[in-house]
Amino acid sequence: MKKVKRSSETENQVFRRPLLYLVTICSRCIITRLQFNNKYTGTAMTESITRDSMQYDVVIVGAGPSGLSAAIKLKQLAEQNGREISICVVEKGSEAGAHSLAGAVIDPIALNELIPNWKEKGAPLTHAVTQDKVLFLTEKKAFNLPVTPNFNNHGNYIVSLGEVVRWLAEQAENMGVEIYPGFAAAEVLYHEDGSVKGIATGNMGVGKDGEPTDSFQPGMELWAQQTLFAEGCRGSLSKQVIERFQLDQNSQPQTYGLGIKEIWEVSSEKHQPGLVVHSAGWPLDSQTYGGAFVYHFDDNKVAVGFVVGLDYQNPYLSPFEEFQRFKTHPEIRKTFEGGRRIAYGARSLIEGGLQSLPKLSFKGGVLIGDAAGFLNMPRIKGIHTAMKSAMLAAEAVFPLLENLEEVENFNSGKEAADYQQRFEQSWLYQELYAARNVRPSFKWGVYLGSIYTGIDQMIFRGKAPWTLKHHGKDNEQLKKAAACKPIDYPKPDGVLIFDRLSSVFLANLAHEENQPDHLVLKNPQTMIDVNYKEYASPETRYCPAGVYEIVEENGSPRLQINAANCVHCKTCDIKDPTQNITWICPEGASGPNYGGM
């Protein structure tokens, strides 16, 4: 096929973008009228709707670092081979970067490969790390620890992940990639042979009772030769394809963490641009994995965050309140006293590493980034690994793409089996291999885990002739409340310690109240019979946004779900002891808008 000029791609993109919105609007007018006339006479909504469809070469679910890197790499490969390919990226956030949350210190190794002239193009990597500190905290004291290779950030940058993602989106759109924010991918579509056909976006304007409102819009079916799942940690559709294709049958159980972050404005006297601080120890006990970070970047701003491994055992533990307590430590509070908190967010992290990675490909699609689990937990970094996984996937997917005009029967999806081999031959595999034994060693507790990590990383250099196993699923680690002691947390003072509601306000949430619940209980009574009676309702503590609340109703306890508070961290989907809670996508553009987070 002859090479297509960039201008042609741009014209095609300009035409297709309004087309998708136009088809959606027209469908709304026609289908809504039919459904209201029929009044849904005993017919489920999904059976009443005839959805419109559009076909692309590639559909990518999620406009994060991995999804956008895959799109850019695919367009680069197409240009190098004189081809034009169509790529659609759907993003559930209100804009690219709206739901992107990380510490974040980025290693530019993958960006150097993807866009070598990123500095000239104005990438928002402007705050180089100038100093690393690693602390071990007791309740009153802080001890400086040696900066091990994992915590050496020379050559790295303190960034806002949201800003990086928005910049990547600009680069992708300039190459002809179509990005549609505000469209939540709600369903995986399959060919008759079981291979992935694409995705369907969610219906919008459905009331809490499941009936259409005046603003009803049906979802769209987006078909593709290859569908790339780049939803991030615990993606709802990624979870489905992993289960359907049994992609994790040869993997160890995945393990997760919950990361909570704030941004503060501090006085110039306390601001140290480029300083990166990591800490372990207090306030967590010796059986709970976790740690904290303090990053000084521009304009007197400091990012402070706290990560708790979701394999913790005590149901009374509250990651949010552990974070608030952390800021009261004498070594930490001196940075923030007199400052002002300006942003808040939370997100789950996928920590299992190499031995927990699922099979990466299946017929019709692949998993990339944190949807698969490429985070390097010992380095507390996942942006560069997500980007590299996406680039490898793009290289494996591109040769499978046929000219759609020449495809007679689009009725089966091919498998990019080469993706796994490319991964195993890359620096990404070597990095994750060297880190593989760190996280599982903490099943022995913080002290033994730390000693083992020192031996593994400093003596064996990550090449020990064995691979440790994780101790099981996170939700299975909780002990019964009767076997644990309640934890007494300090009360909010509005200075260093805050409550959940004032924190969630800073996440800039948007949520249409009149929509079906996106936090689905398989059995509502289980939340009382098991969670409340046996585990003291841990969901009221592990949720960092105050979504779950026990209230009295007619003298009996009842779980109240405040869905509008949800920051889309997915912790409930991971940690609920009976796996009774399923997180699904709410309407597109719902959730936080993290902006400069």
Give names to the regions the model predicted.
Residues 92-139:
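N-terminal FAD cofactor-binding segment of flavoenzymes
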Residues 151-170, 313-317:
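Short beta-strand to alpha-helix junction loop
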Residues 347-373, 377, 504-514, 527-542:
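FAD-binding beta-loop-beta segment adjacent to the flavin cofactor pocket
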